[in-house]
Amino acid sequence: MSVPLLLTEPKLTTAKLEANLFKDVLGSGSTTCAGPSNRWYNIDLAAKRLNGTILLPGETFSYNDTVGPYTLASGYKAAGTYQNGQSVDATAGGICQLSSNLYWVTLKANLEIVERHKHQFNGGYMPVIGTDATVWSDQLDFRFQNNTDYPIKIESYLDKNHKLHVTIYGTDTTGIHGEPYHVVISTVPYKNTYQPKDSIPVGTEPQRDPNYSRYNGYTVD
């Protein structure tokens, strides 16, 4: 008695996978890093930890898990960051520029966003308003899923001119890409707000606290 064999070829073979692995740029973007040397240092350190990250199909990326923890023991330094409406020095200040740059690129790559939080202010380093992504310890994370059929790889680095580059490589099977943009509908000028302080004598001319930055508001679409 003989049993006929029915051979079924897999849709995705090893040879096909290797031939198509990371062959396409799914999204890419660069931003310029300003500020003191500690900020550049933190961004460079985070970019090195992010660089080379590979996500298999269906896997979810966590920015905090990849570049954290945001501590001195982990290698980060104190630099400017936003806290409660103020610009103050805190450990790992500057890393939100990398998370924002990465978010911008994932939108271009048409990847599925799982978690993203906006800043209180427009930081000014993103070319498109609304493409920022703030992160902090275990409270705020930036996460996205590889919703493609192939693995994807992240390349990130800070060049000698303090320009931050992020590129996502994968296999483009759909030809669908995003190009984020914004349109400023209206501008709301900032207003000075004076707060009483017991240590300042009554009648003294008010001074602006240097720890507070003034920003115009934008309504964008």
Regions found by a protein language model. Give the residues of each.
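Well-ordered beta-sheet/strand-loop patches within structured domains
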Residues: 1-221
